[in-house]
């Protein structure tokens, strides 16, 4: 090889090596940026459904199989589903029972899907049986994105016909719930020790009494810690209510309930209660409610100040939903 050609070859090789190094550095930088972006916890929208269940279940100490789905948080479109098999409770203590002469058959219903502070989920399930009502909690363990499951029975309810109608995580070991009577008024606030499933008898939170003829449901919490729910009276229009556990009435010493605004859609009052409420991490309130036909569930945004609902997805095929990271 002549000196000129050798010099040209060396220059080309050096240029090629430089290009390779630059490309490698760029790839590593891009990968690092992606890793950094991926390191940020991305919010996930979860949904829960209750498929048809077998009457062979031991409903006192087992949960029915459920279907946990993930959806696009912006559109509500379901992207994946996980079948959760029957779970046996890890605290199979006996609860109050009441034999009923008139009984139409066993049934199950999901009353909430709520996220814990660590990103895991809790699913309360109420079963109606000839011996009364049984309330159980399904937990995801480790991570809701790649979950394992366990279950607990709710213990120490006062009567066999009391039912957990909504649920909210207050702290690592404490759950706030709305308790009804066979799913109907009167409703009361109670707290559950999530470590053992027991109703906490002491009212350390000074929780308020609830009007005995009104329906209360759909507990949720905004990023600032304010608690929201719906209250429905004889008119059938759900009203958005809120409370802060630190704000108490001077006279009673109980937590104050603020009645904010009736829910409405397209300028008309929302007739019948919504099926669920939850906040995203950005502070946007969402609702699950029946669509115009009443045959499908739809996902809506909710303006907290006006109660105005805006359609996000007209076919959100879940019974309850929650946001988690």
Where are the language model's segments positioned?
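N-terminal export signals
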Residues: 2, 8-29
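An edge-strand/N-cap motif at the start of beta-rich repeat modules
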Residues: 32-75
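Short coil/turn segments that connect the beta-strands within blades of beta-propeller domains
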Residues: 43, 118-119, 172-173, 224-225, ...
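Short loop/turn segments immediately following the C-termini of beta-strands
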Residues: 50-52, 125-128, 180-182, 232-234, ...
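Structural motif
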Residues: 54-69, 130-139, 184-190, 235-243, ...
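Beta-propeller fold detector
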Residues: 78-96, 148-157, 200-207, 250-266, ...
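Repeated scaffold domains used in trafficking and secretory/extracellular systems
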Residues: 89-114, 159-169, 211-220, 269-276, ...
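Short loop/turn segments immediately following beta-strands, especially the blade-tip
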Residues: 141-146, 194-196, 243-252
């Amino acid at each position: 090889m002549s000196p000129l050609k050798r010099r040209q070859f060396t220059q080309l090789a050096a240029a090629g090596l430089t290009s390779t190094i630059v490309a490698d550095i760029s790839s590593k930088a891009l990968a690092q940026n992606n890793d950094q972006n991926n390191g940020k916890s991305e919010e996930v929208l979860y949904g829960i459904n209750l498929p048809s269940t077998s009457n062979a279940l031991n409903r006192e100490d087992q949960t029915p199989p459920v279907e946990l789905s993930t959806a696009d948080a912006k559109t509500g479109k379901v992207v994946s589903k996980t079948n959760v098999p029957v779970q046996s409770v890890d605290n199979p203590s006996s609860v109050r029972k009441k034999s009923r002469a008139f009984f139409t058959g066993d049934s199950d219903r999901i009353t909430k899907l709520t996220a814990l502070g660590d990103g895991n989920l809790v699913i309360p399930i109420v079963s109606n049986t000839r011996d009364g009502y049984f309330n159980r909690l399904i937990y995801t363990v480790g991570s809701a994105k790649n979950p394992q499951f366990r279950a607990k029975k709710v213990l120490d309810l006062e009567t066999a016909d009391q039912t957990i109608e909504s649920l909210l995580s207050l702290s690592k070991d404490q759950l706030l719930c709305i308790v009804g009577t066979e799913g109907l008024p009167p409703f009361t606030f109670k707290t559950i020790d999530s470590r053992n499933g027991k109703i906490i008898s002491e009212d350390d939170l000074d929780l308020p009494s609830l009007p005995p003829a009104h329906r209360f449901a759909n507990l949720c919490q905004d990023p600032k810690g304010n608690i929201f729910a719906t209250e429905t009276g004889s008119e059938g229009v759900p009203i958005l209510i809120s409370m802060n556990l630190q704000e108490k009435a001077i006279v009673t010493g109980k937590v104050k309930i603020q009645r904010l605004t009736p829910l409405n859609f397209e300028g008309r009052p929302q007739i019948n209660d919504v099926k669920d409420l939850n906040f995203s991490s950005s502070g946007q309130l969402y609702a699950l409610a029946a669509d115009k036909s009443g045959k499908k569930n739809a996902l809506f945004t909710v303006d907290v100040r006006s109660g105005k609902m805006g359609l996000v997805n007209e076919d959100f095929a879940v019974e309850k939903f929650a946001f988690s990271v």
